[in-house]
Amino acid sequence: DQICIGYHANNSKKQIDTIMEKNVTVTHAQDILEKKHNGKLCSLKGVKPLILKDCSVAGLVLGNPMCDDFLNAPEWSYIVEKNNPINGLCYPGDFNDYEELKHLVSSTNLFEKIRIIPRNSWTNHDASSGVSSACPHLGRSSFFRNVVWLIKKNNVYPTIKRTYNNTNVEDLLILWGIHHPNDAAEQAKLYQNLNAYVSVTSTLNQRSIPKIATRPKVNGQSGRMEFFWTILRPNDTISFESTGNFIAPEYAYKIVKKGDSAIMRSELEYGNCDTKCQTPLVAINSSMPFHNVHPLTIGECPKYVKSDKLVLATGMRNVPQKKKRGLFGAIAGFIEGGWQGMVDGWYGYHHINGQGSGYAADKKSTQKAIDGITNKVNSIIDKMNTQFEAVGREFNNLERRIENLNKNLEDGFIDVWTYNAELLVLMENERTLDLHDSNVKNLYDKVRLQLRDNAKEWGNGCFEFYHKCDNECMESVRNGTYNYPKYSEESKLKRKEIDGIKWESMGTYQILSIYSTVASSLALAIMVAGLSFWMCSNGSLQCRICI
């Protein structure tokens, strides 16, 4: 009768890497690197993105006439801006601290537009003629919706003095501007005053003077406009004073809801889908801790790494035995590979006795290993799968060195994460395979310590009993209740019987060996004597006897 200790094997082709080996085939493995995506821009946790189409953030906040679709934008999860939107500053010019403004917008989920200085309140100035063919709407000249371009009235431009107090509980985003004419004639035509200025006082003090200069035409305009913005806190006051060239605020934005928004560069349209993680190119819905789809993300995202493969071993080495061995399908132990016939556990036994043969998994050690490995995998995923965002940052032309430094830092972080992820997987895979080897060895030692000299170790993971071991006996070995004294006498007799056969065989071999040696020597002596007699008789050999 025989019992073997072994482990599960299957038809799996999954391969993992360890510190010491590459492409190790295992019975079970779990991929922790997400490579799949849906190729769409999606809502983020049920909230749609604000896709600006051909508009820029500047066109959105100033109210470019071509961006009327976004005049009252609902709450958004993130903003999508094309790489080169055509509807931004329709009247050529510049937006002061534009990158900071985009950063502010990217951390906001909802604006509410309110009127702070009504257009019809400018009774001493022309508030309707300030339009341009550069900002058309329905084929007619128009202007930005949220500001008013004030012109002289009746050849007079009285000094403007306006104050606004923020009585709201929210912060206010306020925008204004200054016009830089092409020449003095245009300055006089529009504002009458040649030495004009625009002064703004709030938490900052700013005084701007028109820069009159000849410039090339852009969008049909030789003049330029410069726009500014500020955040007005609750109960704070902003004051405007101007003698010309003033582009006054009509509307401001209450920052109703701040949050984890972002501005993404993408040419995609809305894909009518929902996701937890969005990149500029695709959406990712995954519970894996790592991904290699795109480095820029928003939402609850896996961490981006440059790896192509991150697979955690959860099972053991998959080395199925080539074929059954011996009579009645005898099978070897774990030294010679795993068992595909054992399907209800990772480790277990195969026995052969007078009642038949069969497999039995050791469910206790299997469950303990499963629990340990499952907890380890879940722990890795939980620790790595925290909310992680990596959004692009905006820099102006004077900040290219900072932008390059920032890019190098981000690339360095990605390299570190990639190295850490790959090293983590290699180390954990090594530990997992060692754990399985240790569990099989522990099972083997458990049997060996019970059987002691009641069975013979074959050295391949199997034991041959010196006594009869029925199914009840086999079960006692498996569950650790084997009664060694009960079978020791029978085993002792069996060992003596085997030893006696050995000694008897050894004695027979010695007698045969002696007989063979004597017979060979006698035959050789007779042959030598006969040869000598023949040679003496024909004179070939002379024999002398001396006394």
Swiss-Prot record:
Residues 532-547 are cytoplasmic. Residues 1-510 are extracellular. Gene3D superfamilies: 3.90.20.10, 3.90.209.20. Its main location: virion. It comes from Influenza A virus (strain A/Chicken/Pennsylvania/1370/1983 H5N2). The record marks 325-326 as: Cleavage. Keywords: Clathrin- and caveolin-independent endocytosis of virus by host, Clathrin-mediated endocytosis of virus by host, Disulfide bond, Fusion of virus membrane with host endosomal membrane, Fusion of virus membrane with host membrane, Glycoprotein, Hemagglutinin, Host cell membrane, Host membrane, Host-virus interaction, Lipoprotein, Membrane, Palmitate, Transmembrane, Transmembrane helix, Viral attachment to host cell, Viral envelope protein, Viral penetration into host cytoplasm, Virion, Virus endocytosis by host, Virus entry into host cell. A lipid is attached at residues 536, 543, 546 (S-palmitoyl cysteine). The chain crosses the membrane at residues 511-531. GO terms for biological process: clathrin-dependent endocytosis of virus by host cell; fusion of virus membrane with host endosome membrane; fusion of virus membrane with host plasma membrane; virion attachment to host cell. GO terms for molecular function: host cell surface receptor binding. Major glycoprotein, comprises over 80% of the envelope proteins present in virus particle. Glycans are attached at residues 10, 23, 165, 235, 285, 479. Belongs to the influenza viruses hemagglutinin family. Disulfide bonds join 4-462, 42-273, 55-67, 90-135, 277-301, 469-473. This is Hemagglutinin. One of its GO terms (cellular component) is host cell plasma membrane. Binds to sialic acid-containing receptors on the cell surface, bringing about the attachment of the virus particle to the cell. This attachment induces virion internalization either through clathrin-dependent endocytosis or through clathrin- and caveolin-independent pathway. Plays a major role in the determination of host range restriction and virulence. Class I viral fusion protein. Responsible for penetration of the virus into the cell cytoplasm by mediating the fusion of the membrane of the endocytosed virus particle with the endosomal membrane. Palmitoylated. It is found in: Virion membrane; Host apical cell membrane. It is a single-pass type I membrane protein.
